[in-house]
């Protein structure tokens, strides 16, 4: 098939007609918002839902937050809701009849148009209308005169259905991720002893007996500071981990911008991480952030604002690491890190952290339980990331 001048790069089979140029206002009805008087705002869910801007939308849906007794401009269930004030172009749909505030407009469109408007946001289409303005906004004429390209109704339906399926799958993955993250938070709270307790509230089957109180220094071979070297471009083998390279949520080594230590690494074996090593951030806003070395991360040297605790063989490093994610540890860091300048915890202070240990077999079981839970969480995070990349690519290539 010959290349067409007015067709997207990616199309479903059996669709060959060129797309038609059109103005948005000639295609659908656009309703600009008008805010009610502030005195008529309420928190009563029996009143009319008021949508004023993107703060009233989450994940592409209107989420009731404010109500009003005064009707100004109305949107119907199923309408598309476009943010017309900073940030301009955010788009959502409403599952309810709503009152439109002046920060939004309603568009009577379908799934295809929803994703077309999503692409326009992605490509900064609306930015040209706010150039030179101190307050980013678009008006009725900007919206109605927006230039769009439309396929046949059948192709619109096919494209809209594809993206709706993608979004439903994304929503499902995000729900699962949230559920597993909530489960982990609950288990961290209940599978380690709380303050004043010597056993946890929840234990795995087959284990009993008191846990022993120890200090972090009792379970480590050494507690050492990192390498005093700047970072350079990644050499393909020797990785350099700094505080910012530890993901705040997953506590995994982020490899999106790898670097190497700017030093002769043949003389730096002391700073090379190995299994059972746990890193602790020692200063700044990230103090207390931890990372458990994973051999899959390869050859990794650790930087000077990190402290390494090398766990003794007779203790389970996964169990010790999960201890550093508990409220007890967070509270210890909060109290200990108080300084006249920026917060910090040194190696000796980390070594004084008190924790409770069960027998080795139970340590292993708990460490494995949380490791498996982390793997589930990471798998959903990866699926979400991959789907979002795919969606962004398809938005770019399936529209004009």
Q: What do the PLM-derived regions correspond to, one by one?
A:
Residues 1-16, 175-209, 382-400:
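Short amphipathic coiled-coil heptad-repeat segments
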Residues 2, 25-150, 217-357:
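DNA target-recognition domains and sequence-specific DNA-contacting regions of bacterial/archaeal
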Residues 9, 128, 145, 172, ...:
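The feature marks the first
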Residues 11-34, 203-225:
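Non-catalytic DNA-recognition/assembly elements of restriction-modification systems
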Residues 12-13, 159-171, 192, 204, ...:
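Hydrophobic structural patches
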Residues 22, 187, 198, 287, ...:
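Short, charge-patterned binding micro-sites
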């Amino acid at each position: 098939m010959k290349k067409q001048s007015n067709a997207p790069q990616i199309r479903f089979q059996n669709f060959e007609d060129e797309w038609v140029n059109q103005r948005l206002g000639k295609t659908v009805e656009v309703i600009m918002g008008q805010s009610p008087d502030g005195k008529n705002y309420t928190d009563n869910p029996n009143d009319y839902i008021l949508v004023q801007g993107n703060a009233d939308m989450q994940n592409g849906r209107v989420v009731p937050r404010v109500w009003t007794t005064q009707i100004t401009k109305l949107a119907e269930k199923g309408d598309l809701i476009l943010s017309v004030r900073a940030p301009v172009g955010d788009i959502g749909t409403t599952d309810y009849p709503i009152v439109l505030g002046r920060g939004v407009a309603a568009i009577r469109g379908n799934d295809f148009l929803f994703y077309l408007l999503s692409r326009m946001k992605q490509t900064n289409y609306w930015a040209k209308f706010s150039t030179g303005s101190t307050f980013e906004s678009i008006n009725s004429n900007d919206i109605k005169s927006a230039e769009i390209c439309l396929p046949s109704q059948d192709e619109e339906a096919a494209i809209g259905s594809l993206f709706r399926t993608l979004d439903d799958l994304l929503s499902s993955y995000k729900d699962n991720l949230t559920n597993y993250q909530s489960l982990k938070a609950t288990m961290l709270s209940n599978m380690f002893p709380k303050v004043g307790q010597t056993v946890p509230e929840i234990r795995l089957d087959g284990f009993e007996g008191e846990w022993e109180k120890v200090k972090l220094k009792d379970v480590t071979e050494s507690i050492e500071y990192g390498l005093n070297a700047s970072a350079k471009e990644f050499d393909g083998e020797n990785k350099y981990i700094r505080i910012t390279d530890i993901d705040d949520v997953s506590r995994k080594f982020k490899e999106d911008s790898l670097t190497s230590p700017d030093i002769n690494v043949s003389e730096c074996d002391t700073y090379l991480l190995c299994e059972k090593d746990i890193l602790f951030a020692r200063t700044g806003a990230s103090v207390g952030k931890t990372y458990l070395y994973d051999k899959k991360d390869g050859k990794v040297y650790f930087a000077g604002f990190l402290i390494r605790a090398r766990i003794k063989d007779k203790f389970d490093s996964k169990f010790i690491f999960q201890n550093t994610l508990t409220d007890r540890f967070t509270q210890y860091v909060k109290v200990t890190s108080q300084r006249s300048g920026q917060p910090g915890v040194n190696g000796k202070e980390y070594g004084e952290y008190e924790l409770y240990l069960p027998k080795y077999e139970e340590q292993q079981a708990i460490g494995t339980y949380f490791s498996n839970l982390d793997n589930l969480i990471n798998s959903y995070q990866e699926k979400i990331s991959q789907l979002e990349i795919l969606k962004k690519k398809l938005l770019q290539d399936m529209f004009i």
